[in-house]
């Protein structure tokens, strides 16, 4: 985005030779007359329903509201005058100016008489819209220069709104000769000031070279903003970097989008000077080199964070097919089987992923707050259990999917970063993975390898579904309405049954934000191993010959469209019976009644927190959404409770999530408190002691070693003690 304000641009008028030539002027007048005719006479409706003059009425309404713009559809212009539409498509810069002049004249006619004090006619901005198929940034070549293009993409950064002169006045420093009302070309093109004063007369001292300066108070300006557009992730060929394009917006197109928005833009593919910086010691070579940008003439925001951008392209035949599919009694099992069918087993995990893809319903409360509808899922366990394969499949299957690995992801890369714009030297904001995945799924592999500081950055994005930024004078909030699917290994590589909760090295705050946590173990079972080996061999043998989906599975393309359709068209709520049932089960689980004891095989006071109750509601809504039903039934609640039972509760009851918010047994909690009290009595503030001797002393008192280490770990996290001398000695701070 550098060099757009470089003044060294020269241009010529493409309407014939001399700009003042009679032929060129006559042609301009004729085209302007035809544009005016279109705006005045284009009408919609039939003889039976009556006609309305679409653009004439719209101009009048907008002008009276103080909004000096109008949106013209290219299809309307083509149906009225095909030649005119062709001219506008091939030479948009020249013809748009005529269209805006025509719109100004029509506005003058339809708004007369205007009230006193408002006699001055305002300029009208014309925005363009088209139903034509969009192109890609990759196919923009030199033959499309100065043509009208339609490009989809994601806005990744936006500059502040600034002023650009449209008409300037200049004055000579020597003789004070003034030239007024000099028109500037729109876009990122500058203006080259005259080198000589045109008032040089005999007998007067000669004016020096470059005598003119701009008079800012006599210039007419408009707002403008520069944006950075990145091509859509699904349009990027495998292994290549996504391409970017600079956009120029002015007047009413400013501040229409924020980073993270998926948009389709109509604009003129233009060029600006390359802008090499001579101060860096490089010669200004490459006279003919120009960098490209798009002068935006219309913006359509494609999504509001629910994946609707894909649902709009569903044909009536596909809609009918999706309704038939949703009405099938076994649709839940069918979708679960279709999730990564090449992976053997793990049906409960696949069912949970199916719920994550469809998601619950986002709710806006009367006080203005929102409750998230997206489901977050964590898979913990042994290597070689196809966790990463499932993540890769979800990225391909989700209407909007972003895949990232924990080790290669920083806090700024996941949320948002503030960088300095090289051209204006101002700070601008660029959205990260969770902003770009707004309305979709973020898949984070190697979640355990992330630095703790980076992991903390996504806390807000996971629960509140916003990302708040306060950096370099920029204070704002971006949307990140996305699900998080994360995969992690245990601390010891493989899951160690004897270590219990020590297998997990996550803070309670992050674990409680996951609706479901699956412990995936590679268990040794001869019968299962035989079936797994047979499945893998079959895959390898038939990999080349099998190109179509197996019967009883939905193929990937149809599944992607079905998910987008369900997310866009259905927002189920709990039925009264289902809500009553869930309330009763919640009370039973909270009170540790007989049912809960039977499920856990031991008496345990593990409460299910409100956050987990909301998770069950979301899972039930997702199950209902698959069937396109407006209400979640008791059966949906039953299945949601079962999924929660086999994931998070099973992990909690086996002691694997001990220490997590709401997931520690009463006796364990009491033991941890006893160890901590004794430790603080024996370990004075300001003293230091060997960690090995502490563990040995407490082990002699029959305390389990993992409990002692857990207490030390908690005190380290709270900052009460710290390691010294290569982690051999502990020093007490408070």
UniProtKB/Swiss-Prot annotation:
Residues at which ADP binds: 371
Motif Arginine finger: chain residues: 512-515
Record-annotated disulphide pairs: none
Molecular functions (GO terms): ATP binding; ATP hydrolysis activity; DNA replication origin binding; helicase activity
The reaction(s) this protein catalyses: ATP + H2O = ADP + phosphate + H(+)
Residues bearing PTM Phosphoserine: 315, 605
PTM sites of type N-acetylserine: 2
Modified residues (N6-acetyllysine): 392, 396
UniProt-annotated location(s): Nucleus; Chromosome; Cytoplasm, Cytosol
GO cellular component: CMG complex; cytosol; MCM complex; nucleus
Classification via SUPFAM superfamilies: Nucleic acid-binding proteins (SSF50249), P-loop containing nucleoside triphosphate hydrolases (SSF52540)
The enzyme's E.C. designation: 3.6.4.12
Primary localization class, coarse: nucleus
GO biological process, one term: premeiotic DNA replication
Alphabetical keyword list: Acetylation, ATP-binding, Cell cycle, Chromosome, Cytoplasm, DNA replication, DNA-binding, Helicase, Hydrolase, Nucleotide-binding, Nucleus, Phosphoprotein
InterPro entries cross-referenced by the UniProt entry: MCM, MCM5, MCM5_C, MCM_CS, MCM_dom, MCM_lid, MCM_N, MCM_OB
PROSITE patterns reported for this sequence: MCM_1, MCM_2
MCM domain ranges (all copies): 331-537
Subunit structure of this chain's protein: Component of the MCM2-7 complex. The complex forms a toroidal hexameric ring with the proposed subunit order MCM2-MCM6-MCM4-MCM7-MCM3-MCM5. Component of the CMG helicase complex, a hexameric ring of related MCM2-7 subunits stabilized by CDC45 and the tetrameric GINS complex. Interacts with ANKRD17. Interacts with MCMBP. Interacts with TONSL; the interaction is direct.
Family to which this protein belongs: Belongs to the MCM family.
Function: Acts as a component of the MCM2-7 complex (MCM complex) which is the replicative helicase essential for 'once per cell cycle' DNA replication initiation and elongation in eukaryotic cells. Core component of CDC45-MCM-GINS (CMG) helicase, the molecular machine that unwinds template DNA during replication, and around which the replisome is built.
Record protein name field: DNA replication licensing factor MCM5
Gene name linked to the record: Mcm5
